[in-house]
C-alpha cells in the first residue's frame, strides 16, 4: 500500500467521508492545501450528500483529475478532453473491480433503509458492514496510477 493509499484510508478511519479521504490524501502534491481539499469535497461524500448516487471516492477521482490536468480555461477543449478521458479510464478501472460506481449498489445490504442527511456514527460495526474503506483504497490506488507523475505541474 502506497503512502497516498495509507493516507486516504487513515483519513477515512479518522471520520472523514469517502470523497474527503481521497482528495485529502492527494491535496498537497496536487497543489491544494489539505484543509481546502477536505472542505471542497465534503458534499460529494456518501454518493453526493448522502443521496447514494456516484460513490464519493469515485467523484473525488474526477475532482483530482481536473485539479491535476485542467488549466481552467473555458475554451481549451484539449485539456477538457484529457480530463474527461482520464476520468472515464479511472471510473472504468473502479467499476471493473467493484461492479458499480453507484454508492447504493456498492453498499448493497449495508445500505440504511431510511436515508437522511445525518451521517452514521463511525463504529466498529460501521466499518465491518460497509465496503467504503475498500472503495477509498481502490480510488487512491487508481489516482496514483493515472495521475501521479502525469499532467501539468
Predicted regions and their residues:
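Structural signal for hydrophobic packing residues in well-ordered secondary-structure cores
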Residues: 12-15, 26, 30, 48, ...
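Short, contiguous, pocket-lining structural segments
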Residues: 14-18, 32, 53, 131, ...
Amino acid at each position: 500500500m502506497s503512502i497516498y493509499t495509507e493516507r486516504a484510508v487513515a483519513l477515512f478511519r479518522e471520520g472523514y467521508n469517502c470523497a474527503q479521504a481521497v482528495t485529502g490524501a492527494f491535496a498537497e502534491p496536487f497543489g491544494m492545501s489539505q484543509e481546502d481539499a477536505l472542505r471542497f469535497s465534503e458534499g460529494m461524500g456518501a454518493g453526493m450528500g448522502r443521496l447514494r448516487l456516484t460513490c464519493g471516492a469515485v467523484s473525488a477521482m474526477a475532482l483530482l483529475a481536473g485539479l491535476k490536468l485542467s488549466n481552467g480555461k473555458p475554451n481549451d477543449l484539449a485539456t477538457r478532453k484529457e480530463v474527461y478521458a482520464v476520468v472515464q479510464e479511472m471510473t472504468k478501472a473502479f467499476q471493473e473491480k467493484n461492479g458499480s460506481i453507484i454508492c447504493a449498489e456498492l453498499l448493497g445490504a449495508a445500505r440504511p433503509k431510511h436515508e437522511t442527511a445525518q451521517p452514521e456514527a463511525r463504529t466498529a460495526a460501521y466499518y465491518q458492514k460497509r465496503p467504503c474503506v475498500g472503495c477509498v483504497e481502490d480510488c487512491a490506488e487508481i489516482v496514483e496510477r493515472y495521475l501521479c507523475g502525469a499532467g501539468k505541474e
